[in-house]
Amino acid sequence: MTFPTNPLEAIGADGAFEIGGGDFSFGQDYTEQIIRSLFTMPPVRLDNAITLLREHLLKLPLEALQRFKEMIPDWAEGAFDTATGAVDAIMDALSEGPLFLKLAEFQVFLQRLLTEPGEVIGEIPQALVNGLTSALETVNNTIQTIVDMLLQALGINPKGDLLDRIFDLSDEIEWLRDTASQVASGLQQTWNHFWSALTGRSPGEDQTVVEPAEQIGELAGTTQSNSSAIAELQARLDAQDHTGIAGGDDFERVNTTAVGPGWAEFYTGGGYGSGRGYYAIKDGHQAEWTDQGATQNTARFVRTDPADEKTVTDYQKMTLVVGTIPGEAAGLFRGGSHIRLWLRVNDNAPTVGITDGVYVEVGGANLAQLGYRRRGSDHFVGSAFNCSWGAGTIFTLVAGTVDGIEKVEFYKNGSRLALWSDDGLRSAIGAGFRRWGWEGQARNRNLGQGTPSSVTRVTINDNDPSGLGGGSVHLETGVVGILQIPNGGTGATSAAEARANLGAEAAIPAGTVAQYWRGDKTWQPLNKVAVGLHLVDNTSDAQKMSAPAVLTNKTISGADNTLTDIPVAALGLGAVNAVRVIAGVPIPNSVTIWIGTEAQFQALPTKDANTLYFRTA
């Protein structure tokens, strides 16, 4: 791996800074001299002075270029929505003669660099000098560096305080206006050289301001692309440290009427077709707002993709990357716009909208504030704080941290700007509040709308500080292929295969025949053999009695289950017990009657006490 060893090597062919350490420690060791070396210019002459001034104005972010609106008459609506459009509008005005340079408003603009630096200079210069405390201690130093470079480009030695230098620059611009008509012949050559420097190629034909401006406009796209990649990388790193959900949307598709699939959309004033503006993915890379009418309209989006629509735990982390169109800030005659990041959203939000959740709102006059919604009612918490934005800005909202589930944090480009502790749990927490989403609002301004930021990527992660994600894993997104048995899976693709692999009982076969599960793990018919009836019943079912059970003077043979008449012998003497004993006295159960002659009676050897003897003669 190689690392840049001089500042210019740290800038790629596309104009983006390359992260790689080296001799400049990710840019933290840049000095004022190194910064100045990045702005080296050729000698200033009458035929290149205006061009050099333009070159440095083109390095300003869109927010700064938009300040020229009030100085340029008859600019087309939407011309200042992009860096390329803003440059085109300014250059078109110059083609008619730089009359706007005479206006006192330009001095006001330069003075505002001192009084309102955060709003005027915008996101990009602040990010460029972020961390360079040894060289540029304050925003004023940043402004002074830019003003000094412009003065030096015009051959003026900077003197006095910053305000004096701004007035000097304004005076020189007035002089340039007077001499602009003399240098028109040199502009074409300058633009050709400018285009060549940007692309590394010599032009085959004369170039106009449009071609170099398009190259510069691409820098905004590069910035948001890099930020999107950084957000995705951070989401993947979070996924390694935590189980649960890791997902999001990069909007890499075309949808000219909405932002789906994967989102439930809700508009307070109607979406596509309402004439009040809407979000769509027209360039195939970002969700951007289309201005329509002059009324306020809020768009809310709730995630519905089954892969990442809800987190596993109450610990959530979401990022949103601003696209190439930063939202309009509020001004004297502008309502501005805002975006919101939403976490802990109610489970039924895809059908009823967001009734519960925690959020951060970024917008208005470059401000942000945390808040929550409970049962449809919004509540801001804490105080609003300064928060500017630009192409590629990464916003992060965290609900639940290592310090507690009630902690809510907001970050911009990795730096925490706000913390709220919901100690009373005023917001909703639990399994019914684990969805997420985002929103953008266009506010009315004069005859138009304040355009909200475009969005190039959103991500979502479980953020359980234990790293366990509640002991749960989203198998659909967290497992590639078949989860094997040693890892807690079944090693199978079907239920039958899983039962076989795990040694589970077989499924009960379909049918109406009674069966039982035998010890050899097979299903067998349930019959008399299975229950042991064959040991007590040696007859076939056909031999069983099927007649009504009516017995009259019958006996049953135990050998063959047959019925026979009761023989008289079975009822004779000795067959029935004839005596019973009551209180020790034998009492006959029956009495025998004897009938015979006197001679026969006398001939009886013994007489029975239980027999009645009747003699006939």
Curated annotation (Swiss-Prot):
InterPro entries: DUF7257, Minor_tail_gp31_C. This is Gene 31 protein. It comes from Mycobacterium phage D29.
